[in-house]
């Protein structure tokens, strides 16, 4: 099977659907992996790293000929127009977005939205929502620390003591728990 990895086109998107480690696993299983040129550049993954892992670097048009396409975000209208019948696409495809769902159904592709995976023990290794929420919780605290006008940890100096920041985190889901842990590690209370 030819598996294609497209460069993400959404503004501000730095993720890529496959890493060199993923490529190694897929090529070990005798799949051919086609990576769009510079697909991983925003994630600090070079084309050479993909080549070293066994992938072939292809143009956007060539990657769209793959049997299975991997994307992080849902394809836009231009990308959906390039899909061919009986092709597979896997990613965060926004299954409740009626416009995208309708466009994908007219192309007669098999679309598998990772958001729809059951969140249970058997599918835990494929649970992208939890892993992304974990990162979001961590990043939220890092950004909050940047905007906060004081310091997170308690500081004791010759000039006096600065009390630790008191942080309120709303929610105790995956993102909230990671935010709590990150803030605590940074010295906040």
Identify the function of each model-found stretch.
Residues 2, 77-166:
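Glycine/serine-rich phosphate-binding loop and adjoining beta1-alpha1 elements at the start
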Residues 5, 34-37, 58-59, 71, ...:
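General beta-strand structural signal in soluble alpha/beta enzymes
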Residues 23, 47, 80, 101, ...:
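Generic hydrophobic/aromatic pocket-lining and core-packing "Φ" positions
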Residues 54-65:
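Short acidic low-complexity segments
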Residues 61, 68-71, 75-82:
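Glycine-rich phosphate/dinucleotide-binding loop and adjoining beta-alpha-beta core of small-molecule
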């Amino acid at each position: 099977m030819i598996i294609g990895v497209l460069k993400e086109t959404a503004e501000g998107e730095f993720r890529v659907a496959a890493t060199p480690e993923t490529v190694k696993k897929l090529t070990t299983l005798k799949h051919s992996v086609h990576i769009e040129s510079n697909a991983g550049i925003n994630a600090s993954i070079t084309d050479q790293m993909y080549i070293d892992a066994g992938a072939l670097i292809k143009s956007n048009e060539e990657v769209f000929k793959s049997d299975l396409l991997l994307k992080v975000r849902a394809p836009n209208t231009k990308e959906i127009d390039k899909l061919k019948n009986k092709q597979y696409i896997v990613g965060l495809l926004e299954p409740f977005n009626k416009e995208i769902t309708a466009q994908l159904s007219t192309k007669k592709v098999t679309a598998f939205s990772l958001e729809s995976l059951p969140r249970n023990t058997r599918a835990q290794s494929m649970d992208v929502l939890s892993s992304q929420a974990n990162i979001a919780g961590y990043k939220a605290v890092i950004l909050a620390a940047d905007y906060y006008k004081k310091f997170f940890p308690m500081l004791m100096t010759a000039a006096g003591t600065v009390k630790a920041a008191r942080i309120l985190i709303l929610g105790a889901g995956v993102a909230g728990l990671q935010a709590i842990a990150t803030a605590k590690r940074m010295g906040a209370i």
